[in-house]
Amino acid sequence: MKNKLDLSLYLVATKGSKSEECFLNTLENAIKGGVSIIQLREKELNAREFYKLGLKVQKLCKSYKIPFLINDRVDIALALDADGVHLGQEDLEAKLARKLLGDEKIIGLSLKKLEQLEFIQGVNYLGCGAIKATPTKESSLLSLELLSQICDKSPIGVVAIGGIDKEALVELKGINLSGVAVVRAIMDAKDAFLAAKELKRKIYENLSLK
């Protein structure tokens, strides 16, 4: 799977205050609109709740044949036999996650500095941002210049994340990205299908999808 990874429209999904039914409907509509990969990110759920929700999201992703990743929690990814995991710089090292998950699973890594490219052994793609201020990352912005440098030097695909919407995609034109990751642009949209469809159109218009 990692050799044919479509990162073009990457959804980071958090249930938040939505009902489970509404959450799963949002994800299904987003997939129908063009989402190519889903990462389940649940910081507020305990392990059992995360696992139970993960089972349902995994079933949905399997039915549409798109990859399903878990944020941070290698243990949950293992328990679910998810397609992979996305790690932050303070999570378990990628090489250890690779040892636990095996060669066929997808491992993504958050990255903000050029020098961190030295430590991406065993990683399939990079997530870089935030591109714009978000409620959780107001003080950790990544300049477009640095993002471009990381993309040019990275031997693996790079996904931009953080405050990305239709307008931001125009600003990313010319940068060698493999895709963009969104949260609120789809999860908070009135119509997840239309939001995803419009984002996908803008992605194809503006990104080379390296």
From Swiss-Prot:
Q: Where does 4-amino-2-methyl-5-(diphosphooxymethyl)pyrimidine bind?
A: 39-43, 71, 110, 137
- Asked whether the UniProt record includes Transcription regulation among its keywords, one would answer no
Q: In which pathway does it act?
A: Cofactor biosynthesis; thiamine diphosphate biosynthesis; thiamine phosphate from 4-amino-2-methyl-5-diphosphomethylpyrimidine and 4-methyl-5-(2-phosphoethyl)-thiazole: step 1/1
Task: Give the note describing cofactor binding and stoichiometry.
Answer: Binds 1 Mg(2+) ion per subunit.
Keyword Magnesium in record: yes
Which GO terms are recorded in the biological process aspect for this UniProt protein? Answer: thiamine biosynthetic process; thiamine diphosphate biosynthetic process
Q: Which GO terms describe its cellular component?
A: cytoplasm
Q: Which UniProt keywords apply?
A: Magnesium, Metal-binding, Thiamine biosynthesis, Transferase
Q: Which GO terms describe its molecular function?
A: magnesium ion binding; thiamine-phosphate diphosphorylase activity
| InterPro entries linked | Aldolase_TIM (IPR013785), ThiamineP_synth_sf (IPR036206), ThiamineP_synth_TenI (IPR022998), TMP_synthase (IPR034291)
Residues binding 2-[(2R,5Z)-2-carboxy-4-methylthiazol-5(2H)-ylidene]ethyl phosphate, per UniProt: 134-136, 163
EC number, UniProt record: 2.5.1.3
Cofactors named for this entry: Mg(2+)
Q: Which reaction does it catalyse?
A: 2-[(2R,5Z)-2-carboxy-4-methylthiazol-5(2H)-ylidene]ethyl phosphate + 4-amino-2-methyl-5-(diphosphooxymethyl)pyrimidine + 2 H(+) = thiamine phosphate + CO2 + diphosphate; 2-(2-carboxy-4-methylthiazol-5-yl)ethyl phosphate + 4-amino-2-methyl-5-(diphosphooxymethyl)pyrimidine + 2 H(+) = thiamine phosphate + CO2 + diphosphate; 4-methyl-5-(2-phosphooxyethyl)-thiazole + 4-amino-2-methyl-5-(diphosphooxymethyl)pyrimidine + H(+) = thiamine phosphate + diphosphate
Q: Specify the domain of life of the species encoding this protein.
A: Bacteria
Q: What does this protein do?
A: Condenses 4-methyl-5-(beta-hydroxyethyl)thiazole monophosphate (THZ-P) and 2-methyl-4-amino-5-hydroxymethyl pyrimidine pyrophosphate (HMP-PP) to form thiamine monophosphate (TMP).
Instruction: Name the family the entry cites.
Output: Belongs to the thiamine-phosphate synthase family.
* PANTHER family from the UniProt entry: THIAMINE BIOSYNTHETIC BIFUNCTIONAL ENZYME, THIAMINE-PHOSPHATE PYROPHOSPHORYLASE
> What protein am I looking at?
Thiamine-phosphate synthase
Gene encoding the protein: thiE
